[in-house]
């Protein structure tokens, strides 16, 4: 088990103005990845402005594993048999986002659109 100093709490609050998907309904969810660890929000049904208010703990030794960023992917949950659709991703640079243990940052991050979502 990782030491308490090796934990990173990631809170995904919301998104706004997400791309509509083919068929018109968007069922977005977010996946936060840091190194090999990840956490995921629940699916917000039929909205392009989801409110997740979701927290996850990621246990990773940032220095030991040479981890310097979190990747946040926003996906559309495809309710049919097809694969989920990537709506875009944001990269959070931990070198500038984390000032010291116990400090929270509250920022909006723009999604870089996934290929084919123009």
Model-predicted segments: where are they?
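Extracellular and analogous surface-interaction loops
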Residues: 1-3, 60-63
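Calcium-regulated, polybasic anionic-phospholipid
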Residues: 4-50, 78
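C2-type phospholipid-binding modules
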Residues: 16-25, 65-118
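Beta-strand-rich interaction surfaces with strong enrichment in secreted/lumenal proteins
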Residues: 40-46, 58-60, 95
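Exposed aromatic-hydrophobic patches
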Residues: 50-62, 92
């Amino acid at each position: 088990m990782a030491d308490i100093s090796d934990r990173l709490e990631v809170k995904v609050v919301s998104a706004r103005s997400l791309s509509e998907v083919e068929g018109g309904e968007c069922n977005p969810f977010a996946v936060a990845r840091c190194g090999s660890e990840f956490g995921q929000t629940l699916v917000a049904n039929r909205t392009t402005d989801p409110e997740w208010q979701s927290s996850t703990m990621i246990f990773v030794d940032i220095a030991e594993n040479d981890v310097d960023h979190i990747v946040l992917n926003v996906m559309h949950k495809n309710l049919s048999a097809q694969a989920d659709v990537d709506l875009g991703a944001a990269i959070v640079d931990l070198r500038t986002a984390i000032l010291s243990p116990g400090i929270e940052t509250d920022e909006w991050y723009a999604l870089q659109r996934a290929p084919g979502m123009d």
